[in-house]
From Swiss-Prot:
Residues 360-392 are annotated as: Disordered. PROSITE patterns: PPM_1, PPM_2. This is Probable protein phosphatase 2C 29. Its EC number is 3.1.3.16. Gene3D superfamilies: PPM-type phosphatase domain (3.60.40.10). Signal peptide: none annotated. The keyword Manganese applies. Residues 44-353 form the PPM-type phosphatase domain. Its cofactor is Mg(2+); Mn(2+). It comes from Oryza sativa subsp. japonica. Mn(2+) 2 binds at D75, D285, D344. Mn(2+) 1 binds at D75, G76.
Amino acid sequence: MGALRRWLPCCCCCCRGGGGGGGGGSVGDGLVWDVALKAHASGDYSVAVAQANEALEDQAQVFVSPAATLVGVYDGHGGPEAARFVNKRLFSLIQEFAAQSGGISAEVLEKAFGETEEEFVASVQRSWPSQPRILSVGSCCLVGAIEDGTLYVANLGDSRAVLGRRSAAGAAHGRKGKNRVVPERLSRDHNVADEDVRRELKELHPDDSHIVLNTHGVWRIKGIIQVSRSIGDVYLKKPEICKSNPMLQQTICPFPLRRPVMSAVPTIKTRKLRPGDQFVIFASDGLWEQLTDEAAVAIVAGSPRRGVAMRLVRAAQLEAARKKDVKYERIRTIEKGQRRHFHDDITVVVLFLDKCRGKAGRGDEIDGTDGPVDVFSLSPDDREDPTRPVLR
């Protein structure tokens, strides 16, 4: 009953921090937003988003309570519908199942992911006759949860969670800076660019020599999609839908499937927090396409906390500009939609881990203001004062 009381008061207080698209952001760039710094049960967190697509396909949310902290980053593809659906349902399901089970566990997270997938698939099956495009909409899904000193990371797709932790190994090898902060990847990229993922798919589909194809130097499942696990992408999980409809065979699914070629079963990592653990970076692949794990961790470790998520976004944009041989200032003036030619939507949540090192989060650093982006807060304390992106 104690766990039930800890979770139930938080289950229906979802406050939207703005409306999606336009407005806010740093001077000269209306497509970036951030929550500079707020408190959670184990420290502080910082959030930032940069829109590149015509419709923002990334979604993010943070839940804060005395019992637990949840972080979600959802990177949509084919449209924003799946990511928005996950943003609406997943945390409620995690809270519901955690209350029933007496707390968060790997089983709770897997069950919540599975129920979210089932609900979205059911919604698609109702909608596709009037909106066939919805069959090809999907979302990567990355969730982090902290409860009772344990960190859980559940993942579908290629969004990524990277821990920054202090290492004492340098002294043993005669190097300076024995307490430097080093990265530890907490999630697995379900992307066929990874040879292990390609091998896994080939083993699951031994009778399909075209299960993964390299087109223009990029590996894709059936030559179509790079990620192997997601919420949605119903046309790649329910072959019977396309088989029964000639029109869909010509448009949405122009190839026969013997069986589903994608999965919604998450990879889940459980880790007891340790005194040397400093922070976790949760981000969509828009960040990781531009920055290595090492570079991202070094930026956070060497920067002030306030606005650190935005600092990562700007570093990614700088790298995108360098790759395209254009000035960073030019990217900041490019409209949504066109900006996708330079970088993807980028979403970053940096979660600092103070309490496990004997230091509580600082409530006086909570700040927020209105901004039109779908960054959600589920904190009970935010019912009358929702988390809102800060004008930077």
